[in-house]
Amino acid sequence: MNLNYQYAGLIPILPVFPSIFIGIGLMSFRKSFRNLRKFVGSMSIAFMFLTLILSLLFFNDQLSESYSYRFLFPWLSTKNLTLDIGYLIDPLTSIMLVLVTSVAVTVMIYSDGYMLHDQGYIRFFAYLSLFTASMLGLIVSPNLIQVYVFWELIGMCSYLLVGFWSTRPTAASACQKAFITNRVGDFGLLLGILGFYWLTGSFQFDIIQDRLNELLLTNNLNFTLFIISSVLLFLGPIAKSAQFPLHIWLPDAMEGPTPISALIHAATMVAAGIFLVARLLPIFQLSPLLMILIAFTGAITALLGACLAVAQTDLKRGLAYSTMSQLGYMMLGLGIGGYQAAIFHLITHAYSKALLFLGSGSVIHSMEPVVGYDPNKSQNIDYMGGLRKYMPITGVTFLIGTLSLCGIPPFACFWSKDEIIADAFFHLPLLGFIAWLTAGLTGFYMFRLYLLTFEGEFRAHKNLKSSSLEYPHESSFSMTLPLILLMFPTIFIGFLGLPYNLGFIQSQILSTWLVGPSIDLNSSSNWIDFFKTSATSVGIAFLGICFSFLLYSPKNASNRDFNQISNPVPKGFLSSYVKSFYNWSLNRAYIDKFYELTWIKWCGIFAQFTSYLDRWFFDGFVNGVGLLTLISGEALRYGENGKVSSYLFVILFSFILLILLGNFNSVFYF
């Protein structure tokens, strides 16, 4: 055992220290502590950088000798129940630790510039550190109970960060929507965990898998309970990773600061669901029906997300739907058993999407002094255009991220997405066709965002009377440095997933676990097979890009009316269909409206009914008894006047009344 593993427990603990320090400082020395803004930011970055170094050490150990290491100690022990806590380091854990910490470091450096003049700068870094620590804690968790604890912490931190600017009504509504939607999935996750404990008597991943295999071999497995528990548990990743039909929270989560949007979409919250399914995939594979459910959930999500991204005019919201679509790819890969391809796409997508979101934040940050601080203007691509001339670093890095997400070789996402599409065609042609069609839509909507934002002429002064005479400018060094740093993995990390033995990479974690069995680089037939597989997906992506150039090239976009810049409607018989599709896409396929008219409306009616029942029936009964007692007491109080004659009169009157009542009853009886 390498001595480094003794310190693995520090990984989720180190980022917590800045949060604790900031919390104590704000509660104890609120005014004076605000003067330590730069110190707080630097400290948070330093602790996260230490966590990254520690993660790299474990990753290096896994490269040289891939094995699992568990450290457990009892937390709660009774006669019938034992709960252990600890940490687990294996290939999946090590690669996820490096991914999360590396993206978090760049996001924190970026946040130092982006949030510099925000009054909540210190509070933001406290939330950001706790958010990252929660994700790291989930990654190293060795059992389902510990997973659930950190799962809920991630949900709480996302609520705080999405609603960071809580004075905005839209931000307050968005954080509530994200929190409540994820509660649906979390409740299913909890029931699923309890179901697996009922089946196996354990929360440990390895023990659950071994006991389920034993029960299956001996025909003692309650398959109905297993399916129900698995589906309930799968609800958690459906909500957390924004899969259909619990995807509705993700676009609204863009109301938070852009750095947290990058972290949520790249390496933390939405990645948590994919990670959990990957961790439990050996268990899910016991049921082919469940794997089909996972695969079709991912395929529907991928296609729906791509369709909804086509007509978005908000830059961040367009990227949000692209995240939803790419998460669908990952879930599809897991559903068809393509564990390696799905995890590889999680890695490549994380760096590409972090680059794109931080680039969008740079754009928004430069647009705000020009068009105002209203998100409906500063994030609207209709007011942008020609920004590459004013923001060359942001423009070039955004283009690289766009090419990667479109799956254009040799950028990162090409290697992983192409493998998922090929696996999907091999297992079920329908799934392969959906994945292939989604690749074309991805090329279309991503270059639509790029062209309308960075190419052509700047449109804000022409179409917005309230805009200033300023022009956007390149962001500060602390904001452009992370873009440059993320550009390198976006270009080169895909080469680590080449399906060939490169000679200098012989490690098991890359050649076997991550990219599959190595094949001979010198064999020309292998190259031919590889290019045959990738030609169709790259071809449809290029077709989408060409169609995007046809509609949104600077020349064509400049000749349109303002209301048709981003969503042009052709003349002729197709106009009504195209307009209907744009409206369908802009209105999120009317899924939110459907939920409002069904679940939300009827839940509101039921809540009002129960509130009325509680106030007027249950509270009315209790309050009525109290009121009757009060009135009776008040009435009897006047009888206590201290006069014996009054007491004798009451006694005599009561005695006569009882006699009369007795005689009345006897007469009625006869």
Curated annotation (Swiss-Prot):
Primary location group: plastid
Subcellular location field: Plastid, Chloroplast thylakoid membrane
CC annotations in GO: chloroplast thylakoid membrane
GO molecular function, one term: NADH dehydrogenase (ubiquinone) activity
UniProt KW keywords: Chloroplast, Membrane, NAD, NADP, Plastid, Plastoquinone, Quinone, Thylakoid, Translocase, Transmembrane, Transmembrane helix, Transport
Gene that specifies this protein: ndhF
Biological processes per GO annotation: ATP synthesis coupled electron transport; electron transport coupled proton transport
Subunit structure: NDH is composed of at least 16 different subunits, 5 of which are encoded in the nucleus.
Name the UniProt record assigns to this protein: NAD(P)H-quinone oxidoreductase subunit 5, chloroplastic
EC number: 7.1.1.-
